[in-house]
């Protein structure tokens, strides 16, 4: 603290004296250092604000500006500015104290005042965020009242709050108790002598300290502080305001008794002690006080008491000053003081109505008001009722009452005129002033009387009691005021005022209906309601009588009105005739309710025969019949008057009216009027009902419109927020996917490079091996050819010998007979001898040279081989022949190699096709583990062998053809042998299978015989089984067991044993299930028979081979699918058909899981070596089914495997068919992913994921059809799940034919001319995905499909179709065209390759074989095409008929 104060002193060198003065001045006031420090800091901040420039036009002052100017200069601001701001927030009272001191400094001159207001205004602008609202109001009010009441030592009380008075008075009290000597001097001596106590002058001039003393009613402190200086008496009225405000009894009594005396002449209280010098001199001379500042008017003091209902001060005035009652005037109002400076006239006018002070909102107690008014009534002081200050003479002339005078104290009685024929009211007061007046004064009175008659019409409206009733003042205050006005409980039997002259009739009715019972009893039972003779046609009693029969009054209120009319029966007769009362009774209640503020009566003269009451005109003529008899018949024959007391009162009035000889009325006229009134009432009620209905409708329509607008606005806002969130999420997902794709592409490129390198190495190794093999084959061929040539040479030599002999014999004959032909032949062809000679002349090494010169690889030559020109073969010819043969053999081997390569390629295509088909069977999820087919490309080469046949003169072409035929025969023979071997093996296998089946049947029979012959054998009815553990097939919930057994000693069955105690509804359910089995559903387990004993029920079921769970866990699911010759989707249909069968009979399985899906292996077929395998549904949950409805029988949680039941089952809600749909979705996922679960493979967390709806379908991303279907099936909201029929109609389960039809329908939608308006939308939708704006195809589809072969034009087609490869629409056209014209395309491709003499693409020809193969090809290239088209065309299915069937 000291260091902080030192910093303040250093920073405030310019005003160091002020700081020290403030510290000295607050030693006793603030004994705590913390308060001392806070006040000093606040004063320093205010002084700093005085340095800021102030401009009235511009507000440049703020905390930021304050920091800029002083933050760098002041040390304490640099360190502790945050702490000072917290001080401003927390120390509210200290802030008020310092600011108040700042306002009350002794400044002379207006300039300094304006400067102070500007400094405070700167302080408010700088620190307004850290000040409370009370302090801000405090400052604003101080600035606004500064000019007007700055010089007043005691300010009006309205500027300060009560809490500040208490706290400042407590601080003042603490300061006095710190020093006993000071306290004694103040209380005992009343004189200040010590100069050290200079701080008390602060409280002398401070109004807050004086207010605290008056509030605590401390008379000694009050007098000692007030009498120090004579200047304190300048505002004596303000002091009395404070005394009356707090009702300080001790201060008022001491002040009045000791220091004031009554001046009877001037009716004032004069101060009699410690007067000023001038006052003492005047008082000694005249013995009267002429100083107005030292006196107060009694009427003014009385008004102070009435403002705040100061009952204690009023008692003192009445009791201590006996002449006070006779000296005060009669015109005392409850409207309070008309302040000259601070109060608003409107607030002054209504202060008594709101019962609160002007600024403090301090509620005055109701009892205090009542006691104060009763005090005046007991002391015979009554309040005037006027607000417009009408002269007393007007009241005297109008009401004939006495008015108390200000100047006269005597009491004389005068007689006054009567205001009623029967009652006389007198007053016991005189007015001597009126007796002493001259004639001139009487003339003035007459003139005033005439002028004031005009104002009297508005007098009732402005009267005090009428305003109190209008603003719903407390009833106790009103009753006390009424009793004062009529001088009740004053010891006077006569009335002074009449209530009907003070309140209007309608206001009286309102007050009687609104006020409580005490007010009504006072008004009615005390005969406060009366009417003067001047208005004999008043409507008050008529209205009372009308409301007696209405529904507005309660049962408690009616007796008061009955009592009133019993006391005053003459009022009814003197006002209106009795028949008119009954007529108006029928209609007045509704009219009064609707037109409460309208005039109830309009009249002109007193004696008029026609008077208008509530819309009725009474123009009745005298008749001979007595109207009283007519009224009596009306009472007896009508149900108008249901109240018996009312009937009695009416009869009393009738009897009373007989004596008065009232007018007569006909009975028929009265009945007609009664009927008319009833009709009018009904019509009015109907009109009111219609109006109300119209109003209600309008209000409802407006409310509905508003609600719709609000809902739309909320929806728009939510949609915008959701869109923004989705866009953000999409951007993030795109970035992540883009990164993933980049990483995947990099990895793929690396893997591709590695694979290419491996393939290159393998190809190099294969080429080397192939070259080695070729070389070996060529070497073998050379050796064989050499051997054959040797053999041929030998044969030639032998043949030459024979030829020589023959030639010798023939030479002679030929020469002789054919000389000329021989010559010609010799020219063309050498003779055989010459050939032989040439052949002999050639060396034998020529053959070897020619053989060695043969190239290892011979190119193919033409089929035309040069024939020998002579029938005689020479060695050269034989060599040529051999060479030709070798060439032919090499050509054939090359052709064989090419054929083998084509066969290998064809086989590879078939293998790929099988893989594609298998992938399609598996739903497109990778290659299953059971597909592993390998082909060896290396084929064994066939060797060339030639038989040693005799030489002939046949051409070489014939030899080659024979050689080819022989090879083909050999190949055919070898193929036949292979086929025979295969058939023999198949027959052997079939025989083995039959033997195995027989053996299996024998084994089963042996096993069953073993079961029967065991010691634990059980026979119940037709069932026979053994209870050993080896014969238990499974265990279930509630003590259920399944055994192997026999039914009727022949048929093997599974016997299910269930306990009756745990399953009370078995019989009902079993009958229903047996009835289902009679309907022959192949996908359901058959219930064969039922037996019972005392404890158990036994069911005979179909004996199956295993369950889906066993297949997956053992890894045999792939073998099961292969052997069934079905796809996995087709096998899943078996389960769906079974559930469809159950749901069609209103049965819910409620416990579907892989353990309850059983496998049934059928018989194998000889042709395909495949079996008719299938899935069947078992365990229909006997404790959970109900046949009568589509709901399951109980709401208990099933006891099957966890993770296959939806959210509503876990919450124990009633279960519907959607439960089975959820389980089917999980089972489909289980099948397609080979054992995975959509909610996690960990069984512990599956239920948690189901509740939170956290599913993981990423393993199915490659198959979007399955992904979308399963996602809808396993959704948390059961209303979103599809039915079993919708599941079967999903594209996932479509066959190829339906898919082709769907593509045709899609193409028709695109081609329709009527759809041209949204064709552009269709193209955009087809090119992009639903979830985001990403394109469906990342690349143009001509890069994904072999388009060049499929675009071959057919024969005779002149127009070629053009396609846009970046649009899905043209892809659909392309697929449809290829499916429709696949045969023509295939022929065109074959012809094109025949013309070009090249080999066609066998893959293209393979998938062009049928429409199904074409669709499979396209699905393998673009897997999710059908799913994409299905999703994009969904919105058009409702409007287009040919699309509707695909979606429903």
Swiss-Prot record:
Residues 666-817, 887-921, 974-1016 form a coiled coil. It catalyses: L-seryl-[protein] + ATP = O-phospho-L-seryl-[protein] + ADP + H(+); L-threonyl-[protein] + ATP = O-phospho-L-threonyl-[protein] + ADP + H(+). Belongs to the protein kinase superfamily. Ser/Thr protein kinase family. It comes from Dictyostelium discoideum (Social amoeba). PROSITE patterns: KEN (PS51392), PROTEIN_KINASE_DOM (PS50011). This is Probable serine/threonine-protein kinase irlB. The gene is irlB-1. One of its GO terms (biological process) is IRE1-mediated unfolded protein response. Keywords: ATP-binding, Coiled coil, Kinase, Nucleotide-binding, Serine/threonine-protein kinase, Transferase. Transmembrane segments: none annotated. Residues 412-423 have a biased composition (Acidic residues). The keyword Kinase applies.
